[in-house]
Amino acid sequence: MVTATHPHSLGRLSRMRHLARQYAALTKPRVTQLAVFCAIIGMFLATPGMVPWPVLIGGAAGIWLLAGAAFAINCLVEQKIDALMRRTAWRPSATGEITTRQTLVFSAILGGAGMWLLHVYANDLTMWLTFATFLGYAVVYTILLKPATPQNIVIGGLSGAMPPALGWAAVAGEVPAEAWFLVLIIFTWTPPHFWALALYRRADYAKSGLPMLPVTHGERYTLLHILLYTLIMIAATLLPFVYGMSGYIYLAAALALGAGFLAYAWKLYRNYSDELAQRTFRFSILYLSLLFAALLVDHYFKFVPQV
C-alpha cells in the first residue's frame, strides 16, 4: 500500500533543510574544514602510533564546534559590512534571514557543546586553549583589530594559526616546540593567503570601509608584502626538518610547494591581474593542505639516512 506525503509536510521539511543550510553557512564550513584538518594533523603528529578514537572524534568535533561558534559571531558582528560586499551579501546574517538573537543562541550552543566535548574526550588544557582561540578570533580579531588596522590579518593571525597546537594538546596534554612550529607555519601563511584574496576583492573591501592593506596602501605595496611574507613562510616550513621532527619526505614537499607558492607571488609582483590573484589564493589553500599532509606521511614513513 502506497501512502502519499502531505504537501504541507514536504514544505515544512524543505524549509527545515533550508534553515539548516543557513545556520551551517554561519560557521563558514570551508574555512572550518581546513582548520579541523590541521588540528587532526596535529593530533597524529603528537603520537608515534594511532590517536585514540575517542580523542580523535571527540576532540575534532569539539574544535569544529568552537570554530563554528567563532565564525558565527564574526558573521554577526560584520553583518552590515557583509551586506555591502558582493562576496558576503548572501550570508543569512547579512540578509537578516537569521536574527541577531538566533545567531547568539546558535553560537552559544555550538560553543558550549564544543567545550563539553573537549572536556570529556580530550583534556582541560585543550578546552581552555580552544576557548582562548575562540575569543582571539571572535573578539580580538573581529571586533578590535579588523576595523582598526591594515595589519589586522598579521596581528590577529595567531587565533587562526592555533588548530595544530589544539590537536597536539588534545593527544599529548601539552604544547611543545614542535606544535608551535606548525602554528608558526600557518601564522606566516595567513598574510599572503588573505592578501591575495583582498587584492582581487579590493573594490568590495573599499566599499565596506575595512582598512585592508590593498585599500590603505595600494596594490604594489601589498604585492611586495605578499612576496616578503612568502619568503618568511618558506623559511618557517623548514623548521620541522631542522629541528628533527620530520625527515626528507617532508623537506622535499616543503621545498617543492614553497617554490610553487613563490612562483605565484613573483608572478603577481611582476605582472598583476585579478585572475592571477584569485589563482594564487586558491593555490595557497591547496599548498597548506598538501604541506600538512606531507607532514603526516613523513611522520609515519620518515626517511632519515643513517650516518
UniProtKB/Swiss-Prot annotation:
Converts heme B (protoheme IX) to heme O by substitution of the vinyl group on carbon 2 of heme B porphyrin ring with a hydroxyethyl farnesyl side group. The chain crosses the membrane at residues 31-51, 53-73, 103-123, 125-145, 153-173, 179-199, 223-243, 246-266, 285-305. Coiled coil: none annotated. One of its GO terms (molecular function) is protoheme IX farnesyltransferase activity. GO terms for biological process: heme O biosynthetic process. NCBIfam families: cyoE_ctaB, PRK04375.1-2. PROSITE patterns: UBIA. It is found in: Cell inner membrane. Carbon 2 of the heme B porphyrin ring is defined according to the Fischer nomenclature. It catalyses: heme b + (2E,6E)-farnesyl diphosphate + H2O = Fe(II)-heme o + diphosphate. Its EC number is 2.5.1.141. Pathway: Porphyrin-containing compound metabolism; heme O biosynthesis; heme O from protoheme: step 1/1. It is a multi-pass membrane protein. The keyword ATP-binding does not apply. Belongs to the UbiA prenyltransferase family. Protoheme IX farnesyltransferase subfamily. It comes from the Bacteria. Keywords: Cell inner membrane, Cell membrane, Heme biosynthesis, Membrane, Transferase, Transmembrane, Transmembrane helix. GO terms for cellular component: plasma membrane. This is Protoheme IX farnesyltransferase. It comes from Cupriavidus taiwanensis (strain DSM 17343 / BCRC 17206 / CCUG 44338 / CIP 107171 / LMG 19424 / R1) (Ralstonia taiwanensis (strain LMG 19424)).
